């Protein structure tokens, strides 16, 4: 009997030829850990500063975040991925909701900075708010890149698409990585952080229109938040 993942000649089967019952081995803790940490920080910040304006009731955003955490852990876990296919649309929907929440949080912060509020009068509270929003933007955009690039984690594993939506250095120059290299969540998290920090692509190039637009939006939001928060914080300290 031929072993799973091997041809009759003993060579490993190509990922594109694998069926829906293929074992997907990307670990979930690199995804769960930063998201769980972000959820904990936002909850603690809400408890410490209850006067902070948020979108909807206090339980709304944490509920969406916790739901996303469970969906991402369950979708394409380290077992038969074909059985969890329906969870990916749920994960994308929850990430989209978080992206909307993040954009609203950016608008609220910018409005508070322009009009003034109790939170923005304190340099410490202002910097904490800015840091949380910046971190949330980087994390959420990283999740979006991870779920949308080349059809998602499973499609990348199976190499269903010939051309990526975002091209990493290892894909542009195969000599920089082992044979069969594929980006995992940590690569997309770093992409989200560097785009929010450098306000432009660094070692990862957007190839498709949606990726270019998403990076442009992320850079503009990050630039606006950082610029206004730092300017207001300097005034609050002086």
Which ranges hold each PLM region?
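Short, Lys/Arg-rich, polar N-terminal cytosolic tail immediately upstream
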Residues: 1-24
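Cytosolic-side membrane-entry/anchor segment at the start of a transmembrane helix
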Residues: 70-117, 122
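Membrane-proximal soluble regions of multi-pass membrane proteins
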Residues: 150-203
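Pore domain of cation channels
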Residues: 182-238
